[in-house]
Design a protein with these regions (language model features):
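Glycine-rich phosphate-binding loops of nucleotide-dependent enzymes
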Residues: 1-191
Length: 191
Protein backbone atom coordinates (compact mmCIF):
# COMPACT_ATOMS: atom_id res chain seq x y z
CA UNK A 1 0.00 0.00 0.00
CA UNK A 2 0.88 3.62 -0.17
CA UNK A 3 -0.35 7.01 0.93
CA UNK A 4 -0.95 9.65 -1.72
CA UNK A 5 -1.43 13.22 -0.55
CA UNK A 6 -3.16 15.82 -2.69
CA UNK A 7 -1.98 19.33 -1.90
CA UNK A 8 -3.57 22.65 -2.67
CA UNK A 9 -5.34 25.57 -1.10
CA UNK A 10 -8.89 25.08 0.14
CA UNK A 11 -11.33 25.07 -2.74
CA UNK A 12 -8.87 23.87 -5.38
CA UNK A 13 -10.64 20.57 -6.01
CA UNK A 14 -9.30 17.96 -3.58
CA UNK A 15 -12.78 17.22 -2.21
CA UNK A 16 -14.36 17.01 -5.68
CA UNK A 17 -11.56 14.71 -6.87
CA UNK A 18 -12.16 12.27 -4.01
CA UNK A 19 -15.92 12.41 -4.56
CA UNK A 20 -15.38 11.70 -8.29
CA UNK A 21 -13.20 8.68 -7.51
CA UNK A 22 -15.88 7.44 -5.10
CA UNK A 23 -18.56 7.83 -7.77
CA UNK A 24 -20.33 10.64 -5.90
CA UNK A 25 -19.57 13.37 -8.48
CA UNK A 26 -20.02 13.19 -12.23
CA UNK A 27 -16.84 13.64 -14.24
CA UNK A 28 -17.01 16.11 -17.13
CA UNK A 29 -13.53 15.51 -18.57
CA UNK A 30 -10.17 14.12 -17.64
CA UNK A 31 -8.13 10.96 -17.66
CA UNK A 32 -8.84 7.42 -16.65
CA UNK A 33 -8.75 5.83 -13.24
CA UNK A 34 -8.07 2.14 -13.68
CA UNK A 35 -8.22 -0.67 -11.17
CA UNK A 36 -5.98 -3.67 -11.82
CA UNK A 37 -7.08 -6.55 -9.64
CA UNK A 38 -4.21 -8.62 -8.30
CA UNK A 39 -3.49 -11.77 -10.28
CA UNK A 40 -1.78 -14.92 -8.98
CA UNK A 41 0.95 -14.69 -11.63
CA UNK A 42 2.13 -11.28 -10.36
CA UNK A 43 4.06 -12.70 -7.43
CA UNK A 44 6.81 -15.15 -8.19
CA UNK A 45 9.13 -16.06 -5.30
CA UNK A 46 8.08 -12.90 -3.49
CA UNK A 47 9.00 -10.65 -6.43
CA UNK A 48 6.49 -8.43 -8.18
CA UNK A 49 6.22 -9.34 -11.85
CA UNK A 50 4.39 -6.79 -14.00
CA UNK A 51 1.55 -8.27 -16.01
CA UNK A 52 0.28 -6.49 -19.11
CA UNK A 53 -3.51 -6.56 -18.92
CA UNK A 54 -6.34 -4.10 -19.20
CA UNK A 55 -7.61 -2.44 -16.07
CA UNK A 56 -11.18 -1.68 -15.11
CA UNK A 57 -12.36 1.91 -15.65
CA UNK A 58 -13.74 3.51 -12.48
CA UNK A 59 -14.81 6.88 -13.90
CA UNK A 60 -18.55 7.04 -14.50
CA UNK A 61 -19.39 4.17 -12.16
CA UNK A 62 -21.44 4.60 -9.01
CA UNK A 63 -20.23 3.18 -5.67
CA UNK A 64 -22.16 -0.09 -6.10
CA UNK A 65 -20.70 -0.67 -9.57
CA UNK A 66 -17.21 0.06 -8.24
CA UNK A 67 -17.73 -2.47 -5.45
CA UNK A 68 -18.90 -5.13 -7.95
CA UNK A 69 -15.58 -5.02 -9.80
CA UNK A 70 -13.69 -5.74 -6.60
CA UNK A 71 -12.78 -2.31 -5.25
CA UNK A 72 -13.82 -1.89 -1.63
CA UNK A 73 -14.05 1.87 -1.14
CA UNK A 74 -13.94 3.64 2.18
CA UNK A 75 -14.56 7.38 2.19
CA UNK A 76 -14.05 9.79 5.08
CA UNK A 77 -15.64 13.02 3.82
CA UNK A 78 -14.76 16.54 4.88
CA UNK A 79 -18.21 17.04 6.42
CA UNK A 80 -18.20 14.47 9.23
CA UNK A 81 -21.83 14.83 10.29
CA UNK A 82 -23.36 16.08 7.05
CA UNK A 83 -22.01 13.35 4.79
CA UNK A 84 -20.15 10.84 6.95
CA UNK A 85 -22.32 10.02 9.94
CA UNK A 86 -25.92 10.66 10.97
CA UNK A 87 -25.70 12.96 13.98
CA UNK A 88 -28.97 11.90 15.58
CA UNK A 89 -28.03 8.22 15.45
CA UNK A 90 -25.84 6.43 17.98
CA UNK A 91 -22.57 4.61 17.26
CA UNK A 92 -24.06 1.15 16.54
CA UNK A 93 -26.62 2.60 14.11
CA UNK A 94 -23.89 4.57 12.33
CA UNK A 95 -21.80 1.39 12.09
CA UNK A 96 -24.78 -0.37 10.51
CA UNK A 97 -24.94 2.22 7.72
CA UNK A 98 -21.78 0.77 6.16
CA UNK A 99 -22.95 -2.85 6.25
CA UNK A 100 -26.72 -2.86 5.81
CA UNK A 101 -26.52 -3.93 2.14
CA UNK A 102 -24.70 -7.11 3.16
CA UNK A 103 -27.73 -8.23 5.20
CA UNK A 104 -30.09 -10.91 4.01
CA UNK A 105 -33.82 -10.39 4.07
CA UNK A 106 -35.79 -7.60 5.70
CA UNK A 107 -34.33 -8.08 9.19
CA UNK A 108 -31.16 -6.31 10.26
CA UNK A 109 -28.55 -7.88 12.52
CA UNK A 110 -28.08 -5.38 15.35
CA UNK A 111 -25.45 -7.42 17.23
CA UNK A 112 -22.61 -7.02 14.72
CA UNK A 113 -22.83 -3.19 14.55
CA UNK A 114 -22.99 -2.98 18.34
CA UNK A 115 -19.91 -5.21 18.64
CA UNK A 116 -18.10 -3.10 16.03
CA UNK A 117 -19.09 0.13 17.82
CA UNK A 118 -17.69 -1.23 21.09
CA UNK A 119 -14.49 -2.30 19.32
CA UNK A 120 -14.03 1.15 17.72
CA UNK A 121 -14.77 2.83 21.07
CA UNK A 122 -12.19 0.69 22.87
CA UNK A 123 -9.43 0.64 20.23
CA UNK A 124 -9.64 4.32 19.30
CA UNK A 125 -10.44 5.52 22.81
CA UNK A 126 -13.65 7.27 21.78
CA UNK A 127 -14.86 9.34 24.72
CA UNK A 128 -18.63 8.91 24.95
CA UNK A 129 -21.04 8.49 27.88
CA UNK A 130 -22.42 5.34 26.22
CA UNK A 131 -22.76 3.65 22.85
CA UNK A 132 -26.36 4.90 22.71
CA UNK A 133 -25.33 8.57 22.81
CA UNK A 134 -26.10 10.37 19.51
CA UNK A 135 -22.80 11.05 17.74
CA UNK A 136 -23.63 14.76 17.34
CA UNK A 137 -23.05 15.07 21.09
CA UNK A 138 -19.44 13.89 20.77
CA UNK A 139 -16.46 16.20 20.26
CA UNK A 140 -15.13 16.68 16.72
CA UNK A 141 -12.17 14.41 17.42
CA UNK A 142 -14.37 11.63 18.74
CA UNK A 143 -16.74 11.96 15.77
CA UNK A 144 -13.71 11.64 13.46
CA UNK A 145 -12.51 8.53 15.31
CA UNK A 146 -15.96 6.93 14.94
CA UNK A 147 -16.04 7.74 11.22
CA UNK A 148 -12.49 6.58 10.46
CA UNK A 149 -12.94 3.47 12.62
CA UNK A 150 -16.12 2.51 10.76
CA UNK A 151 -14.52 3.00 7.36
CA UNK A 152 -11.37 1.06 8.23
CA UNK A 153 -13.45 -1.78 9.70
CA UNK A 154 -14.90 -2.36 6.22
CA UNK A 155 -11.47 -3.68 5.08
CA UNK A 156 -11.11 -1.32 2.13
CA UNK A 157 -8.75 -1.65 -0.82
CA UNK A 158 -8.94 2.14 -1.25
CA UNK A 159 -9.33 4.50 1.72
CA UNK A 160 -9.98 8.13 0.83
CA UNK A 161 -9.94 10.90 3.42
CA UNK A 162 -10.74 14.56 2.86
CA UNK A 163 -8.99 16.66 5.49
CA UNK A 164 -8.44 13.69 7.80
CA UNK A 165 -7.27 15.73 10.80
CA UNK A 166 -8.65 19.23 10.17
CA UNK A 167 -9.63 20.87 13.46
CA UNK A 168 -8.48 17.97 15.64
CA UNK A 169 -6.23 18.13 18.69
CA UNK A 170 -2.67 16.82 18.43
CA UNK A 171 -3.39 13.49 20.18
CA UNK A 172 -6.39 12.69 17.98
CA UNK A 173 -4.42 13.74 14.89
CA UNK A 174 -1.62 11.37 15.90
CA UNK A 175 -4.16 8.53 16.35
CA UNK A 176 -5.66 9.15 12.90
CA UNK A 177 -2.22 9.33 11.23
CA UNK A 178 -1.25 6.04 12.89
CA UNK A 179 -4.45 4.41 11.62
CA UNK A 180 -3.70 5.58 8.08
CA UNK A 181 -0.13 4.25 8.30
CA UNK A 182 -1.43 0.88 9.58
CA UNK A 183 -3.70 0.68 6.54
CA UNK A 184 -0.76 1.40 4.24
CA UNK A 185 1.17 -1.48 5.84
CA UNK A 186 -1.81 -3.77 5.13
CA UNK A 187 -1.63 -2.94 1.43
CA UNK A 188 -4.47 -0.41 1.36
CA UNK A 189 -4.16 2.56 -0.99
CA UNK A 190 -4.76 5.71 1.08
CA UNK A 191 -5.58 9.00 -0.64
Amino acid sequence: GEILGIAGISGSGQKKLLEAIAGLQSVQSGGHILYHPPAPDEAIAGQHVPVDRAGEELIGKDPLQIRKIGVSLAFVPEDRLGMGLVGDMDMPDNMMLKSYRAGRGPMLDRRAPKTLAQQVKDELEVMTPSLSTPVRRLSGGNVQKVLVGREIASSPTLLMTAYAVRGLDINTSYTIYNLLNEQKKKGVAVV
